[in-house]
């Protein structure tokens, strides 16, 4: 949520910044409604002041034994008028809140401006792309011999785009998750296994709705709906909603391992088959609450952890600074970490690290007391650390051998009982 006071003070500048994300944005409706709200507040305060004066006159008249009937009627009329104004004010405030809730976060000043991902900038590349002495296989082709995934079984029970892991695929998935969780813990993150269902207001707080309402799975729970989380960012942010932290508590680092549920997975087409784009996947999520001065430090910390893991997994990767047209609704800055997938002949995102400034905390009401005792909104950051489906694809496709086997990254072997190679099921 954006600060209406800043919009009111510098409307042209705010609109210019927002149009870098969406050229169609106009702040005129917001400013017009804000003007109405302020006028109604003034009218309300004026009537309240008049009512107080009349109440004093009534008290004085009664003390002096003077008939106060007319004064009492005036107060009753004022009270009725005030009630109407207050109701109108509540309606206009709700409308203003709704308009503000659809405005994205401002992009940072150093973000490349573009309408889509074509404007993203590769800022770092690490590792050489693999050179094979044989025709490399797509991970679904490798799976025919490895027998670690079963999309057909999942399609029977749930539908297309839902994965089912089996045999050593289960062990490899949990090895990745355990490795990543231990990495977060070693870097001082507090670990969580949170609920997978959240209230609608928690999705609002993290910025997923109202703009993207309808894109999430939900279940009916009495008179309300609970939503399956699209990322643990939602619930980690929600844990501190409406809280007032102390400055000494910050920065506060959280990490969670959860399944994530996304409805849009099936829209990419046949090219992104298998695990490249699915409705359900595991992800370790990093989240931080900071002061404004700690924001950049936390960002670098998250980014370094992601790079550390990709380096230890010995996967070729690159970092891309996202343009305004490819950034999320809540982010002011995002760097994607992308791994090379030989089966796709392209780099694919396995982590997005984002700074969200005070955008989410204003929606969630998360504040802290600064050293002067003044209440301030915290800054929030989030980053995947990491998402497993494409990571597993990268491991399978980059480490495949001519006989269809796959070399296990050394860093994962302790979590697999020392297993060094995934052999085809018949070997």
Swiss-Prot record:
It is found in: Cytoplasm. ATP binds at residues 262-264, 278, 349-352. L-serine binds at residues 231-233, 285, 384. GO terms for molecular function: ATP binding; serine-tRNA ligase activity. Signal peptide: none annotated. One of its GO terms (cellular component) is cytoplasm. InterPro entries: aa-tRNA-synt_IIb, aa-tRNA-synth_II, aa-tRNA-synth_II/BPL/LPL, Ser-tRNA-ligase_type_1, Ser-tRNA-synth_1_N, SerRS_1_N_sf, SerRS_core, tRNA-bd_arm. Catalyzes the attachment of serine to tRNA(Ser). Is also able to aminoacylate tRNA(Sec) with serine, to form the misacylated tRNA L-seryl-tRNA(Sec), which will be further converted into selenocysteinyl-tRNA(Sec). This is Serine--tRNA ligase. It comes from Chlamydia pneumoniae (Chlamydophila pneumoniae).
